[in-house]
Amino acid sequence: MVLRFPKFSQSLAQDPTTRRIWFGIATAHDFESHNEITEERLYQNIFASHFGQLAIIFLWTSGNLFHVAWEGNFESWVQDPLHVRPIAHAIWDPHFGQPAVETFTRGGAVDPVNIAYSGVYQWWYTIGLRTKEDLYTGALFLFLISAISLIAGWLHLQPKWKPNIAWFKNAESRLNHHLAGLFGVSSLAWTGHLVHVAIPASRGEYVRWNNLLDQLPHPQGLGPLFTGQWNLYAQNPDSSSHCFGTSQGAGTAILTFLGGFHPETQSLWLTDIAHHHLAITLLFFVAGHMYRTNFGIGHSLKNLLDAHIPPGGRLGRGHQGLYDTLNNSLHFQLGLALASLGVFTSLVAQHMYSLPSYAFIAQDFTTQAALYAHHQYIAGFIMTGAFAHGAIFFIRDYNPEQNKDNVLARILDHKQAIISHLSWVSLFLGFHTLGLYIHNDVMLAFGTPEKQILIEPIFAQWIQSAHGKTSYGFDVLLSSTNGPAVNAGQHLWLPEWLKAVNDTSNSLFLTIGPGDFLVHHAIALGLHTTTLILVKGALDARGSTLMPDKKEFGYSFPCDGPGRGGTCDISAWDAFYLAVFWMLNTIGWVTFYWHWKHLTLWQDNVSQFNESSTYLMGWLRDYLWLNSSQLINGYNPFGMNSLSVWAWMFLFGHLVWATGFMFLISWRGYWQELIETLVWAHERTPLANLIHWRDKPVALSIVQARFVGLAHFSVGYIFTYAAFLIASTSGKFG
C-alpha cells in the first residue's frame, strides 16, 4: 500500500474523508502525538528544527540587505538621513497605469519603489555601514551563515550526530552555554563591533578588515585596560556639537556614561551603548559560570530548588519536585521561554521609541509608529502562546505525585481564589472606566463639558517627577533641586538625563493628564481580562467542578456530546481562542493610545489629545475618523495617490476581518449541508463530473473552523490597523 499523507499517523492516513488533509496539517507539528515517536526522537527533531529556523532568519535578513543594496538608495540616504526617503525595494509591476508609476517613483528613484518603514537604514547607518558594498558583503555573509545552519540541521538528524536524551536534559551545561557562550560572547562581540567599527564611523573614520589593526579605537590602545586606568576610556566624549558621521565635535572616549541623547541624532550616545553591552557581557560571563558541570563547583539546580522551602511553612514543600517537573516537560520550558520573550518584546516596543538607539530614527515618525505596533502585536501572540503551552503542560506532563504540596500544586489548590480575584479586578476596571467615559460623553452631548469627571494621574506624575520631570512641581528625588541623589549624580549621567526628561520634543516621559488616566485603566481592563481567560484556561485544563475528568479529553475538544450539557467551549484551547480576541482588542487600545498621543506631539498639537481623549466620541471622531479620512478617499475616479495602496489594504483588511465572523458564527452543520449540496451539483454537471475525488469532502471540525475564523479575524484586524497607521502617519509627515 502506498503511504499517504500524513505518514506520522496511520489512522489519519487511512481516513477516507478530507479530514485526513486538514487534521494532518493541524497535527503536523504535534510531534508527541505521532506514531513511533520516542522522547529521544522528539528532542532530536526539535533540536534539528532550530537550525532550520536560524537558516530562515539569516536568509530573510540577508534578503533585506541584498534588496536595499540592489534597489535601494542607501548611499544617498546616508548623505542626508532626515530628508531622503529610504527605499525598501523596487516595484516591478506597478498596476493602474501612468498615474501609479508617477506616484510611486520617489526617494530619488527612476522607477516605482516602496519606502522602508522598518528602520533598517537607521540601524545599518548607526552600526557603521556606509556603502552598497558594505550591504552586499553583509548579505553574502548572512547567506553563508544560513547555508551553514541548514547543513547543521541536516547533520544533527544523521545517526552519528544525534545527541542523546541525557545531553538534552543536562540543565546546568545548557544554562552555562546559553548564558556565557551565547549571550555573553555575542554581547562581547557586539561591544567589539561598536568600539572598533561603529564609533569610529560616527566620527568619520571608515574601519574595515583591511585597516582594522591599524586604526586604534582609542588613542592609548589597550594601555589603560592593562594598567587599571579604565576611566581614561570615558574621558573626552563627543561634544554636544558633534556632527554624526564626521570628525566635527568628535571626542576619543569609547565607553561612557553620559546619559540622555545625542543632540543631532536624538538617539542614545553610541559610547553609552558600547558601555552597556560590555556591562551585560560581564554579567552573563559570571552567570555562565555559576552552575555545576565538569569540575564539581557551582550550583546544582536540583539542590538549589529542593532547598527552597520557606521556613514559615506557608508554601508547603516550596520548590521541591520542580526540577524534574520542569526538566522533563518541554511544554513547561516553552511556556516559561515564551512568557519571558513576550514581556521582553513588549519592553522592546516601549524602549525603541522612548530611548531610541539608532541615529535619526526618532525623527522618522512613520517608522517609529510601525515598529511600536509591530513589537506590541508580536508580544501579544507570544504571551498567549505561553499560557497555551502552560495548559498543555498541565494536561500532558504534570504529575500530581511528583509535585505534592509544592508551589505548583498549591497554585492549583488556590485556583478558584486566583480566578475570582482576576474576575473581580476585571469587573471593577470595566464598569468604572466605561462609566467615566460614558459620563463624559453625555456631558459633551448636553453641551456641558465642564461637568466631565477628569482625574489627574497624580501617582504616575509623582513617579515621573521622581525620575526628574519638573513640570508637575512635585520637587521629589531627581526633580528636587537639592536632594542627595541629585548631588551624587551631577558629575555622571544626571545632567544629560534631566535635559532629556524635560525636553518636550522627545518621547521620554510624556506629560500625562486625565485622558491618559482613563485610557490607562481601559488598557488595564484589557490586560486583566486577557489574563483572566488565559489563567483560567490553564488552571482548569486538568479539570473543574463542572468537568472533573477534563484532562482525559485533551487540550482541544468541542464538547462531550449532547448527553452532558455545559461541556462545550471549556477546553483549554477554547480559553486560548477567546483570549486572543481580548489580546487583539487590548493591543488595539494600546496602539491607538500611543499613536494618537504621538501624532499630536509630532504636530505640536497636544491639546487635541488632552481635550478629546476623555470621552469615547473624541476617540472615534478625532482619532479614528479624522485619521482614516484620507484612506477612505485613497483612490477615486480622479486617479490615485501614494496612499492608494494603503487605502486598498485598509478595505481588504476589513473584508478579511469580516470573513472571520462567517466561520465564528455558523457552525459545522451549515457547512456540511452546503458541501453535500455542492457535491450533488458537481456529480451532475457535465465535464466537472469527469473529476473524482479520493477523499470524501466533509466540513471542518468545530475546533478547526474556529481556528480559521480566529486566523481571519487576527490577520484582517492587523492588516487594517497597519494600513491605517502607516497611511495616516506618512500622509502627514512623508
Swiss-Prot record:
Binding sites annotated in the UniProt record for phylloquinone: 671
Membrane topology recorded in Swiss-Prot or TrEMBL: Multi-pass membrane protein
Residues noted as binding chlorophyll a B1 in the record, renumbered to the chain: 654
Primary enzyme class: oxidoreductase
Family: Belongs to the PsaA/PsaB family.
Quaternary structure and partners: The PsaA/B heterodimer binds the P700 chlorophyll special pair and subsequent electron acceptors. PSI consists of a core antenna complex that captures photons, and an electron transfer chain that converts photonic excitation into a charge separation. The eukaryotic PSI reaction center is composed of at least 11 subunits.
Name of protein: Photosystem I P700 chlorophyll a apoprotein A2
Gene name of the encoded protein: psaB
